[in-house]
Amino acid sequence: MQRLMCKGKIHRATVTQAELDYVGSITIDALLLAAADIRPYEIVQVTSLRNATRWKTYALPAPEGSGKICLNGPPAHLFQPGDLVIILSMGMYEENEIADLVPRVVFVDEQNQIVKIEEHHLITNGEALT
Protein backbone atom coordinates (compact mmCIF):
# COMPACT_ATOMS: atom_id res chain seq x y z
CA MET A 1 0.00 0.00 0.00
CA GLN A 2 1.19 3.50 -0.77
CA ARG A 3 0.63 6.52 1.46
CA LEU A 4 0.42 10.17 0.44
CA MET A 5 3.04 12.01 2.51
CA CYS A 6 4.38 15.55 2.83
CA LYS A 7 7.75 15.76 1.07
CA GLY A 8 8.40 19.49 1.30
CA LYS A 9 6.86 22.85 2.05
CA ILE A 10 7.46 26.56 1.84
CA HIS A 11 6.18 28.06 5.09
CA ARG A 12 4.51 31.49 5.35
CA ALA A 13 5.40 32.78 1.91
CA THR A 14 3.90 36.12 0.91
CA VAL A 15 1.83 36.25 -2.28
CA THR A 16 3.39 38.92 -4.51
CA GLN A 17 0.97 38.72 -7.46
CA ALA A 18 -2.37 37.25 -8.52
CA GLU A 19 -2.92 37.07 -12.30
CA LEU A 20 -6.50 36.11 -13.15
CA ASP A 21 -6.02 36.08 -16.93
CA TYR A 22 -3.07 33.65 -16.91
CA VAL A 23 -3.74 30.02 -17.91
CA GLY A 24 -3.11 28.55 -14.44
CA SER A 25 -0.40 27.47 -12.00
CA ILE A 26 1.59 29.13 -9.24
CA THR A 27 4.86 30.83 -10.14
CA ILE A 28 7.47 30.42 -7.38
CA ASP A 29 11.02 31.77 -7.04
CA ALA A 30 13.24 28.97 -8.42
CA LEU A 31 15.48 29.08 -5.32
CA LEU A 32 12.47 28.29 -3.14
CA LEU A 33 11.41 25.45 -5.42
CA ALA A 34 14.85 23.86 -5.25
CA ALA A 35 15.12 24.32 -1.47
CA ALA A 36 11.73 22.63 -0.92
CA ASP A 37 12.44 19.86 -3.47
CA ILE A 38 9.57 20.95 -5.72
CA ARG A 39 10.04 20.37 -9.46
CA PRO A 40 8.55 22.46 -12.27
CA TYR A 41 5.04 21.20 -13.12
CA GLU A 42 4.81 19.29 -9.83
CA ILE A 43 1.37 19.46 -8.20
CA VAL A 44 1.33 21.53 -5.01
CA GLN A 45 -1.30 22.54 -2.49
CA VAL A 46 -1.47 26.22 -1.56
CA THR A 47 -3.17 27.12 1.73
CA SER A 48 -4.08 30.65 2.78
CA LEU A 49 -3.34 31.62 6.37
CA ARG A 50 -5.91 34.44 6.00
CA ASN A 51 -8.97 32.35 5.19
CA ALA A 52 -7.89 28.67 5.14
CA THR A 53 -8.59 28.38 1.40
CA ARG A 54 -6.75 25.46 -0.20
CA TRP A 55 -5.95 25.20 -3.89
CA LYS A 56 -4.10 22.53 -5.86
CA THR A 57 -2.19 23.53 -8.96
CA TYR A 58 1.20 23.01 -10.56
CA ALA A 59 4.39 24.93 -9.84
CA LEU A 60 6.34 26.97 -12.37
CA PRO A 61 9.73 28.58 -11.69
CA ALA A 62 10.18 32.36 -11.39
CA PRO A 63 13.64 33.94 -11.65
CA GLU A 64 16.02 32.94 -8.85
CA GLY A 65 16.08 35.42 -5.99
CA SER A 66 12.99 37.26 -7.25
CA GLY A 67 10.87 36.33 -4.24
CA LYS A 68 7.96 35.89 -6.63
CA ILE A 69 4.89 33.97 -5.48
CA CYS A 70 2.15 34.47 -8.08
CA LEU A 71 -1.19 32.65 -8.18
CA ASN A 72 -2.31 32.38 -11.80
CA GLY A 73 -5.79 31.83 -13.21
CA PRO A 74 -8.84 31.04 -11.05
CA PRO A 75 -7.04 31.11 -7.66
CA ALA A 76 -6.44 34.83 -8.24
CA HIS A 77 -10.00 35.19 -6.91
CA LEU A 78 -8.97 33.48 -3.66
CA PHE A 79 -5.41 34.70 -3.00
CA GLN A 80 -4.31 38.34 -3.07
CA PRO A 81 -0.92 40.07 -2.87
CA GLY A 82 0.14 40.26 0.76
CA ASP A 83 -1.59 37.01 1.78
CA LEU A 84 0.55 34.53 3.69
CA VAL A 85 0.46 31.00 2.30
CA ILE A 86 1.87 27.55 2.90
CA ILE A 87 2.93 25.70 -0.25
CA LEU A 88 2.97 21.94 0.28
CA SER A 89 4.30 19.22 -2.00
CA MET A 90 3.37 15.59 -1.56
CA GLY A 91 4.56 12.23 -2.76
CA MET A 92 3.33 8.64 -2.78
CA TYR A 93 5.52 6.33 -0.74
CA GLU A 94 5.57 2.60 -0.12
CA GLU A 95 5.48 1.53 3.53
CA ASN A 96 9.17 0.56 3.43
CA GLU A 97 10.15 4.04 2.13
CA ILE A 98 8.42 6.07 4.84
CA ALA A 99 11.07 5.51 7.53
CA ASP A 100 13.64 7.18 5.25
CA LEU A 101 11.41 10.12 4.30
CA VAL A 102 12.91 13.50 5.28
CA PRO A 103 10.58 16.36 4.27
CA ARG A 104 12.18 19.78 3.85
CA VAL A 105 10.53 22.86 5.35
CA VAL A 106 11.68 26.19 3.90
CA PHE A 107 11.09 29.24 6.10
CA VAL A 108 11.06 32.62 4.37
CA ASP A 109 10.99 36.28 5.39
CA GLU A 110 8.54 38.97 4.25
CA GLN A 111 10.35 39.24 0.88
CA ASN A 112 10.23 35.45 0.37
CA GLN A 113 13.96 35.09 0.91
CA ILE A 114 15.12 31.90 2.62
CA VAL A 115 15.72 32.33 6.34
CA LYS A 116 16.11 28.69 7.32
CA ILE A 117 15.69 25.18 5.94
CA GLU A 118 14.77 22.32 8.26
CA GLU A 119 14.70 18.62 7.52
CA HIS A 120 12.03 16.79 9.48
CA HIS A 121 12.67 13.15 10.25
CA LEU A 122 10.26 10.40 11.20
CA ILE A 123 8.31 10.95 14.40
CA THR A 124 8.84 8.17 16.93
CA ASN A 125 7.64 7.93 20.52
CA GLY A 126 5.87 11.27 20.09
CA GLU A 127 9.03 13.21 19.23
CA ALA A 128 10.32 14.38 15.86
CA LEU A 129 13.85 13.29 15.09
CA THR A 130 15.58 16.28 13.47
Where are these regions (language model features)?
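Peripheral, non-AAA+ core regions of ATP-driven protein-machinery
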Residues: 3, 8, 97-122, 126-130
